[in-house]
Amino acid sequence: MGFNEKLHAYIAARFYVRLTHTFGEKGKAAFIYATQYYAEQRGRRMAMRAIQDGQPLTYETYRAYGEWESTKDMQEEGCANRSETVSTDPVYEFHVTVCPWHEEFKTLGLEEAGLVYCAHLDNSIARGFNPYLVYEVTQTLHDCPFCVQKVSNLQGLAPGQTAQGAFDPAKARPEADRRRGFTYHCAHSYWSYARCAARIFGRAGRQLADEVLEDISGEWGASYSNFLLKYKADDFEMI
């Protein structure tokens, strides 16, 4: 098994546990801040690629320029992300019925961490992509039969703006060039939480991040934690 959705979830879960156990409500606030920080960076990378390709920052473009796709690991386990669209206009609403992140948080007995994570992730990705998209996560799989996500202002219009161009598939770079593998996503997640913890809590935050790295090594193997260290100096705003 390689870098995948479940390791991505595990990283967030361990930061949640260590931050809240060490710093209480301050730790929870730091976890939310770091989740938003991570997600907004991801959304900005998507937006920069779209702008390079001459695409408008609409919800259609957002969907086309998403950075991840289900891994073979999750497909083989039967828990790859599955969703169904229930409306497209004026509000785009879809329901997620199977999610590997939910599966991992549940396996770890950390549904509370999953609730907090999922409440702040996707809306923050959208905010990084275009803050005028209105993205709401009104329920999640952690406490409901399915996750509900709703998006309005689908054109991403700013106040006073009346129209945007349409997404043009012919202008889009190859799909593979819009994606990043889960090695990258896991590294981005780890270093987002680690950097935010260090900036907020100083030496104690740096020590906490090192302990999460030890958690990863113990649960997944030293090769995973060692690989994450290779990204220590990376600028995750860059595309």
Where are these regions (language model features)?
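N-terminal accessory segment detector
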Residues: 1-91, 100-120, 127, 133-146, ...
